[in-house]
């Protein structure tokens, strides 16, 4: 089965899918293809827990029930900086601006734009 993932680092977000049977290392290869950083310079995390390269995504807890297209699972990403890895840092998403008044729903029972269907 496919799992749907949101790989996040600082303000970067990658949406991808993979098989439950794919290994963490194979997921790092996907990241390498996008961000041009080799797997040995990457660390992937689930809930602040470092993921083992040899484990499958299913063994790490990513299943088709927990990582769905409409609600992808979050994977943290950290890169190697010189001899050590940077701390895991994921910036929160920004809040959208408030809707303009013309786009807010009207409280009236019927709208002037509604027409009777005959």
Swiss-Prot record:
Q: Indicate where the modification N-acetylmethionine is found in the sequence.
A: 1
GO BP term, example: positive regulation of proteasomal ubiquitin-dependent protein catabolic process
Please give the chief subcellular localization of this protein. Answer: nucleus
Polar residues compositional bias: what residue ranges? 107-118
The listed locations are:
Nucleus
Sorted alphabetically, which keywords does the UniProt record give?
Answer: Acetylation, Host-virus interaction, Nucleus, Phosphoprotein, Transcription, Transcription regulation, Ubl conjugation pathway
List the residue ranges of the region (Disordered). 92-118
Kindly name one Pfam family recorded for this protein: ubiquitin
Q: In which pathway does it act?
A: Protein modification; protein ubiquitination
> Where in this chain does the record put each Ubiquitin-like domain?
1-66
Which SUPFAM superfamilies has this protein been placed in? Ubiquitin-like
Subunit composition? Heterotrimer of an A (ELOA, ELOA2 or ELOA3P), ELOB and ELOC subunit. The elongin BC complex interacts with EPOP; leading to recruit the elongin BC complex to Polycomb group (PcG) target genes, thereby restricting excessive activity of the PRC2/EED-EZH2 complex. (Microbial infection) Following infection by HIV-1 virus, component of a cullin-5-RING E3 ubiquitin-protein ligase complex (ECS complex) hijacked by the HIV-1 Vif protein.
What does the UniProt function comment say about this protein?
SIII, also known as elongin, is a general transcription elongation factor that increases the RNA polymerase II transcription elongation past template-encoded arresting sites. Subunit A is transcriptionally active and its transcription activity is strongly enhanced by binding to the dimeric complex of the SIII regulatory subunits B and C (elongin BC complex). Core component of multiple cullin-2 and cullin-5-RING E3 ubiquitin-protein ligase complexes (ECS complexes), which mediate the ubiquitination of target proteins. By binding to BC-box motifs it seems to link target recruitment subunits, like VHL and members of the SOCS box family, to Cullin/RBX1 modules that activate E2 ubiquitination enzymes. Component the von Hippel-Lindau ubiquitination complex CBC(VHL).
Q: Which family does it belong to?
A: Belongs to the Elongin B family.
> Under what name is this protein listed?
Elongin-B
What is the species of this protein? Homo sapiens (Human)
Upper lineage ranks? Answer: Eukaryota, Metazoa, Chordata, Craniata, Vertebrata
User: Gene name on record?
Assistant: ELOB
